[in-house]
């Protein structure tokens, strides 16, 4: 990554031109989004687009709201009482905040990979087949093909093709995370959410996940939350900087990291806080 240096000091407070929506069609459109934990407003008037077949990175200090925003995209907050979202989150023109929405179908369309690998306590084969069976009834031969395709898509097939009956828990940490990615894409989502997917992995495993993300964007729209700013710079086309529940700056990744409009973005990127 190119060394980042700044020759000017930016003014404090909101900066004009700090929110630049990506070019091209939007897969997800967020408008006037607010989110509440009880009476506490955790997200404040968020407006942004996730470009189709691109990687959008969310950065910011702990507690800034980036993971909260990510989990709104597949309504994970519905699992917890007292949490609610207001505004619009449009997926291909349909508001996913609609209370009548089928959440199982939404979570098939919007998959998620978590910080810690979470393989099911079952075989590698069944880790992949389990999700497919929730939505489809297919023959054994069709299932075999789908499992292989998902494992290839997760860059894991060549490492496990001779031990599909082994437990998913027997794999290394990096392999387990790729298994979780394969499990996610097996149900044919349109959007994949990554919440700190490499924070528990070694550098070699991290590099494999980053290479995989670059390949996956050919078929999927991707959003990734990361504390690793170098990772955000490597894998994404657009970057959003969040602070205290607000979207401070959003635009092309190169610009965010080399010439941000807002002083808070500059201070975070240069390590002055966070």
Swiss-Prot record:
Catalytic activity: phosphate(out) + ATP + H2O = ADP + 2 phosphate(in) + H(+)
Bilayer topology term: Peripheral membrane protein
One Pfam family per UniProt: ABC_tran
UniProt entry tagged with the keyword Transmembrane: no
Enzyme Commission number, as recorded: 7.3.2.1
Lineage of the species this protein comes from: Bacteria, Pseudomonadati, Pseudomonadota, Alphaproteobacteria, Hyphomicrobiales
Protein name: Phosphate import ATP-binding protein PstB
PROSITE patterns named among the record's database cross-references: ABC_TRANSPORTER_1, ABC_TRANSPORTER_2, PSTB
Cellular component GO terms, alphabetical: plasma membrane
Keyword presence, Translocase: yes
Assigned protein family: Belongs to the ABC transporter superfamily. Phosphate importer (TC 3.A.1.7) family.
Signal peptide start-end: none
Span of domain ABC transporter: 28-269
Compartments, record wording: Cell inner membrane
Top-level EC class as recorded in UniProt: translocase
Known partners and oligomeric status: The complex is composed of two ATP-binding proteins (PstB), two transmembrane proteins (PstC and PstA) and a solute-binding protein (PstS).
Task of the protein: Part of the ABC transporter complex PstSACB involved in phosphate import. Responsible for energy coupling to the transport system.
Any single GO BP term: phosphate ion transmembrane transport
GO molecular function, one term: ATP hydrolysis activity
Residue sites binding ATP per the record: 60-67
UniProt cross-references to CDD domains, sorted A to Z: ABC_PstB_phosphate_transporter
Keywords, sorted A to Z: ATP-binding, Cell inner membrane, Cell membrane, Membrane, Nucleotide-binding, Phosphate transport, Translocase, Transport
């Amino acid at each position: 990554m190119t060394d980042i240096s700044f020759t000017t000091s930016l003014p404090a407070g909101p900066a004009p031109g700090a929110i630049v929506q990506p070019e091209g069609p939007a897969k997800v459109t967020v408008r006037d989004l607010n989110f509440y934990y009880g009476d506490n407003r955790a997200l404040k008037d968020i407006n942004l687009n996730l470009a189709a077949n691109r990687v959008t990175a969310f950065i910011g200090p702990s507690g800034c709201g980036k993971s909260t925003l990510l989990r709104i995209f597949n309504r994970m907050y519905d699992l917890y009482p007292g949490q609610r979202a207001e505004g619009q989150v449009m997926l291909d023109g349909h508001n996913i905040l609609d209370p009548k929405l089928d959440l199982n179908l939404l979570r098939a369309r919007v998959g998620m990979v978590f910080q810690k690998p979470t393989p099911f306590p079952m075989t590698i084969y069944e880790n992949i087949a389990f999700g497919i069976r929730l939505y489809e009834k297919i023959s054994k031969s069709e299932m075999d093909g789908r499992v292989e395709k998902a494992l290839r898509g997760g860059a894991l097939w060549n490492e496990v093709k001779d031990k599909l009956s082994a437990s998913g828990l027997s794999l290394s940490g990096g392999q387990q995370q790729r298994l979780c990615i394969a499990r996610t894409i097996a149900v044919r989502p349109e959007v994949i959410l990554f919440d700190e997917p490499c924070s528990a992995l070694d550098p070699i495993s991290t590099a494999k996940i980053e290479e995989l993300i670059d390949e996956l964007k050919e078929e999927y729209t991707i959003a990734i939350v990361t504390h690793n700013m170098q990772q955000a710079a490597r894998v994404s086309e657009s970057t959003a900087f969040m602070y205290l529940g607000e979207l401070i700056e959003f635009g092309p990744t190169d610009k965010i990291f080399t010439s941000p409009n807002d002083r808070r973005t500059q201070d975070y990127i240069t390590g002055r806080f966070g």
